[in-house]
């Protein structure tokens, strides 16, 4: 679909359809009022007759409105004006796109971006409209023998902005929105792939393809033989029970004109399937453990998005591919592992494997002398208990970095909330036999997992994103969400300078 922006009066638009808002109860938005005036009260008379209340998501398609050059006018219910928030705005956009496709419109001019959303500017409204549109149209049917027939005639969507001065802002919002949507789709596609196909080698092949597609990207794949030489015994232990080789994909993006500029490093947990190992998970819902690689998928999607944008940064994305399976060679509860850092870990539960993979990767990335490191992982069920399925968790050893990520989450509407990393939680990780245990008990499980990781991130500014509750959905809408690609790209946009959305 093609997106563009323009600034003009609604009555002068020659289009298949104009989209305008109506508030509850039966109150016209400013743009709808203009059309009503041109049409000598035609629209308001329909509302008085009760054809549309203005409740969120209600739609009324009008044909040949007097005085209006466009063929049709779509009235969109937006609820009560003072209650129009971010979530409702995006839901309205998605419902509008679905309706436009159902009506057979090939193009439309959308004035919903002129609605007032508290605390949000034109850039945000246009970018979120692009992202919501792309997200609403996403479908994963790669393995359907009969593809569902979906009617999608809409080919062009024009967003109207209030003044010509905001055209550049709108165009930039479209550029960012399309790049982010591309990254979100890549993340979703990886996450939704079945684990018999999307194993660590498949992750590595996708990383190589990214390097083939973009000159600014190079990819290095590290297999088990090289990991052994590096001393990554903790990472290797997790994959021992699987016949699929563990592979770490290092994706390097160079966009900074200064070749000596320190890179930002993103690390993604890539457990392509997590059975729990010897500490086997319950059978119910185990199929969803293919989503335990969504951290790596989000890093992959982020790298694709920034390559499309050409951000003037150096960024390294690491996909920590691995599969946790039971077997005669699998690691066991009671094992003591020597990590790449030299610290030892007593394994109390083989289903707390993500941290055992990530700890070695966090040590590995020291060689890049990073500006900062952000790891992303579907790490703990405790995070789901704490924050549910709406907000990701942020934990960090560096206050400014934590604030940056939370701020980026607010800007992008891909929300995250900071949890503490107090010294007291480290007490729960003590082991009588090793430097630490790999679990700290049920209390504060998301925090103790991050405390474990922090022991391997002392040489740089580091943050941890626990996306266990936000990376995928269960039930009828089952599938990867593509989060937190929007958050990560916003963080990097802000870091890049000059492309900051708030400028």
From Swiss-Prot:
Q: Give the residues the record marks as binding Mn(2+) 1.
A: 274, 351, 353
- Sorted alphabetically, which InterPro entries does this protein's record hold? Leucine_aapep/pepB, Macro_dom-like, Peptidase_M17_C, Peptidase_M17_leu_NH2_pept, Peptidase_M17_N
Gene Ontology cellular-component terms for this entry are: cytoplasm
A Gene Ontology molecular function term of the record: aminopeptidase activity
Q: Which SUPFAM superfamilies does this one have?
A: Macro domain-like, Zn-dependent exopeptidases
Q: Which co-factors does it depend on?
A: Mn(2+)
Localization, per the record, is: Cytoplasm
A Pfam family that the UniProt record links to this protein: Peptidase_M17
Say which domain of life the source belongs to. Answer: Bacteria
Signal peptide from the UniProt entry:
none
The EC number(s) given in the record are 3.4.11.1, 3.4.11.10
Q: Which reaction does it catalyse?
A: Release of an N-terminal amino acid, Xaa-|-Yaa-, in which Xaa is preferably Leu, but may be other amino acids including Pro although not Arg or Lys, and Yaa may be Pro. Amino acid amides and methyl esters are also readily hydrolyzed, but rates on arylamides are exceedingly low; Release of an N-terminal amino acid, preferentially leucine, but not glutamic or aspartic acids
Q: Which residues bind Mn(2+) 2?
A: 269, 274, 292, 353
Q: Where is the active site?
A: 281, 355
Similarity comment: family membership: Belongs to the peptidase M17 family.
PANTHER family per UniProt:
CYTOSOL AMINOPEPTIDASE (PTHR11963:SF23), LEUCINE AMINOPEPTIDASE-RELATED (PTHR11963)
| HAMAP family found in the cross-reference section | Cytosol_peptidase_M17
NCBIfam families for this protein:
PRK00913.1-1, PRK00913.1-4
Protein role: Presumably involved in the processing and regular turnover of intracellular proteins. Catalyzes the removal of unsubstituted N-terminal amino acids from various peptides.
Entry protein name: Cytosol aminopeptidase
Q: What is the lineage of its organism?
A: Bacteria, Pseudomonadati, Pseudomonadota, Gammaproteobacteria, Vibrionales
């Amino acid at each position: 679909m093609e997106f563009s922006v323009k600034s003009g009066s609604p009555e002068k638009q020659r289009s298949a359809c104009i989209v305008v808002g109506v508030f509850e109860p039966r109150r016209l938005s400013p743009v709808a009022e203009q059309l009503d005036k041109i049409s000598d009260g035609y629209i308001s008379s329909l509302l008085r007759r009760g054809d549309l209340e203005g409740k969120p998501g209600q739609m009324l398609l009008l044909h040949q409105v007097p005085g209006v050059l466009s063929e049709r006018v779509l009235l969109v219910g937006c609820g009560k004006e003072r209650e129009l928030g971010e979530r409702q705005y995006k839901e309205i956009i998605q419902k509008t796109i679905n309706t436009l496709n159902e009506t057979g419109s090939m193009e439309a001019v959308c004035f919903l971006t002129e609605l007032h959303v508290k605390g949000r500017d034109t850039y945000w409204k246009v970018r979120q409209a692009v992202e919501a549109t792309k997200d609403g149209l996403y479908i994963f049917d790669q393995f359907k023998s009969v593809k569902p027939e979906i009617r999608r005639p809409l080919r062009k969507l024009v967003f109207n902005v209030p003044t010509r001065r905001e055209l550049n802002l709108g165009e930039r919002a479209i550029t960012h929105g399309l790049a982010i949507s591309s990254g979100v789709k890549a993340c979703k596609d990886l996450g939704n792939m079945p684990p018999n196909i999307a194993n660590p080698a498949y992750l590595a092949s996708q990383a190589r393809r990214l390097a083939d597609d973009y000159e600014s990207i190079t990819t290095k794949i590290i297999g088990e033989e090289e990991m052994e030489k590096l001393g990554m015994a903790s990472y290797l232990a997790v994959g021992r029970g699987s016949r699929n080789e563990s592979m770490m994909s290092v994706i390097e993006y160079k966009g900074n004109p200064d070749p000596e500029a320190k890179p930002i490093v993103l690390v993604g947990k890539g457990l392509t399937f997590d059975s729990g190992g010897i500490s086997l998970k319950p059978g119910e819902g185990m199929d969803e453990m293919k989503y335990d690689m969504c951290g790596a998928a989000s890093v992959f999607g982020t790298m694709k998005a920034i390559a499309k944008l050409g951000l003037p940064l150096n960024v390294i994305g690491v996909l920590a591919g691995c599969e946790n399976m039971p077997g005669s060679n699998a690691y066991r509860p009671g094992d003591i592992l020597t990590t790449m850092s030299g610290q030892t870990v007593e394994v109390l539960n083989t289903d707390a494997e993500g941290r055992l993979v990530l700890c070695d990767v966090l040590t590995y990335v020291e060689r890049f002398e990073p500006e900062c490191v952000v790891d992303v992982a579907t790490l703990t069920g405790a995070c789901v208990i704490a924050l549910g399925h709406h907000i990701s968790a942020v934990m960090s050893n560096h206050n400014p970095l934590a604030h940056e990520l939370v701020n980026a989450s607010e800007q992008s509407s891909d929300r995250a909330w900071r949890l503490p990393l107090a010294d007291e939680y480290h007490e729960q990780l003590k082991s009588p036999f090793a430097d630490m245990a790999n679990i700290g008990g049920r209390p504060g499980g998301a925090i103790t997992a991050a405390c474990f990781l922090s022991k391997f991130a002392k040489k740089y500014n580091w943050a941890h994103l626990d996306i266990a509750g936000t990376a995928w959905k269960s039930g009828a809408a089952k599938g990867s969400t593509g989060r937190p690609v929007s958050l990560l790209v916003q963080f990097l946009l802000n870091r890049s300078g000059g492309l900051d959305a708030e400028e």
